Each structure stands twice: as C-alpha cells, then as structure tokens.
C-alpha cells in the first residue's frame, strides 16, 4: 500500500466522496505518474505502451463492482495528458468512478487533459461518475479539460411506421 501525502488524501476525499482505497480495481495517477494500482478478479488495468494512460478491461462476469481511477495534480506548472480506454464486455455491470483534483499553490498554470474512451458491449450496464475539483491558495490557474467518447451497440425497436 502506497503512503499518500495529506494534499493527495484531501483531494481524493473530495473527488471520490471519501471512498477511494487501495483495494479492488483502482489506479491512482499523481503528478503525471501512476503511483499505485490494483486489479480485481473481473477488472484488469494495464498501462499503455504507446501513450500516457491506461486500458481498463471489464469482463462480462463483472456484477456490481466499482473501479476507481482518480488523478491528483499538486505541482504548479504541471500539464498532464492521459488517455484512458475502457473495454466493457457484453453483460457487465460496473460503476466507474473517475475525476481529477488540482491543488495549485503556485503561480503557474496546472492542467489535466483526460481523454476517456468507452467501448461498451451489448447488455452492459455502466454507471460513470466523474468529478473535477480545484483548490490552492496560489495565483496559478487550475485547468480541467475532460473529453469523453462512447462507442456502443444500440438496439432500437422498430417504430409503427417501420413495421408497416
């Protein structure tokens, strides 16, 4: 278990409602680096090899599990760009808790650009929660720039007009 400093713990309490712990499926990114992560039986997290970020694989047997992937920036002048891709298999039931908190007590801009892409299988139930938070007594900006892309299979019932 990684020992977290008071700033990181305080920011995590806000963006994850005091629920983050280093158990189950999780990945904590701090100041541009993944500092700890864990897998569960049905959720596996792999570090990307071609760009910053992670791939999260959620198998179809996942039933009511949660995965936490918070980011904390506490250095002034830091820019963090991350690509997180979620692969949710058919029939999975999962809660994904993301979010970023910036503590900036300096005079330079601190920025997090988080790009999340979801590939959702048939009959999967995904609850996605994302919180963003900025604090600090410095004059530097706290910029949070999330992007969310979702790819899924949709089934629509034929309308009366389509049925003839």
Locations of regions flagged by a protein language model:
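Short, Gly/Pro- and small/polar-rich lid/capping loops
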Residues: 1-40
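Conserved beta-strand/loop scaffold segments within soluble protein domains that form the structured core
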Residues: 27, 35-157, 161
């Amino acid at each position: 278990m990684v020992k977290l400093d008071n700033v990181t713990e305080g920011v995590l309490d806000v963006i994850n409602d005091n629920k983050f712990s280093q158990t189950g499926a999780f990945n904590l990114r701090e100041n541009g680096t993944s500092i700890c992560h864990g897998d569960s039986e049905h959720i596996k997290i792999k570090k990307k090899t071609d760009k910053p970020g992670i791939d999260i694989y959620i198998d179809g047997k996942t039933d009511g599990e949660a995965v936490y992937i918070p980011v904390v920036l506490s250095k002034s002048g830091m820019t963090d760009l991350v690509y997180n891709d979620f692969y949710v298999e058919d029939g999975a039931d999962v809660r994904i808790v993301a979010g970023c908190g910036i503590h900036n007590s300096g005079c330079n801009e601190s920025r997090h650009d988080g790009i999340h892409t979801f590939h959702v299988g048939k009959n999967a139930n995904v609850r996605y929660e994302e919180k963003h938070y900025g604090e600090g007594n410095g004059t530097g900006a706290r910029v949070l720039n999330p992007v969310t892309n979702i790819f899924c299979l949709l089934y629509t019932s034929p309308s009366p007009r389509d049925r003839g």
